[in-house]
Amino acid sequence: MNIPMNIPAYAEIGITTNFSFLRGGSHPQDYVQQASELRLPVIGIADHNTLAGVVRAYKELGNPDVIHKPKLLIGSRLIFIDDTPDILVYPRDRAAYGRLCQLLTRGKRGDDTEKGECHLGLDDLVEFSEGQLLVLTLPHRFETDKALGVLDRLQRSRAEGVWLAASLLYRGDDKRRLGRLHRMAATARVPLLATNEVLYHHPARRPLQDVLTCVREKATVDAIGKRLEANAERYLKPAAEMARLFRELPEAVAETMRFSKRITFSLDQLKYQYPDEPVPPGKTAQQHLEDLTWAGVQQHFPGEIDATLRATLRKE
């Protein structure tokens, strides 16, 4: 597929995979393959309160059939219990990734948290915000003052940066909504970031995503009504299509690449680090291990032990 030279580069941020239970209609691998076909330079996975989907996307980058390998941004979409709108969180570096993991762990380990739940409030995010790139996403209908309050709180945190997401999903009032978002971003002095709020890699997956929504909402296709998406637009779109949609605000498309360039973290930076063992002064770790072993032998086998067992212990 040839991309015209005058089409600006575009990074799709905030992709939902099937690791967001009963929400995403495509596998992480599907997105990598589709991004390669579309020659998108960057894609950002952000599943609901989890980092689970990014591993399979990362592994797919090693598939030789993926010719044009996109840069993979590792993030999560935080869903809050205190009425805060969803926020996309992307760690800038390895240290920020660790803080995001700690934040998600806190949300899943509360005393009143059931399996599969994640209880987080805006205060929790602010506490772990250092080094994070934060993108506020808003529902179709939102209160401007409340959204501005959230943006202000995020800007006063230790985050690496704050953005406001903007999408055009053919819902009938896109132009008016985009105007509101543009004015809000100007008021808050944050950049507007284009996104298609992707739920599946190709429009053909829309029927599957509808079924997932019905299962989640415990309703039949006939009865679910407006809880389904109005169309099949929430797929991974080529840069040319996003540029056309945002032709009145091209900066929102350009901002996606500026956003992605600020992120240096990649999963290949993660390596297992064996924890330091407490060792008595003057002893090596091996010597201390041998001392503990022989102390255990005396505890479990008091007195003399036979030569065979002694030889086995020395070998081990």
Whereabouts are the PLM-identified features?
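Phosphodiester-processing cores and adjacent nucleic acid-binding clamps
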Residues: 1-316
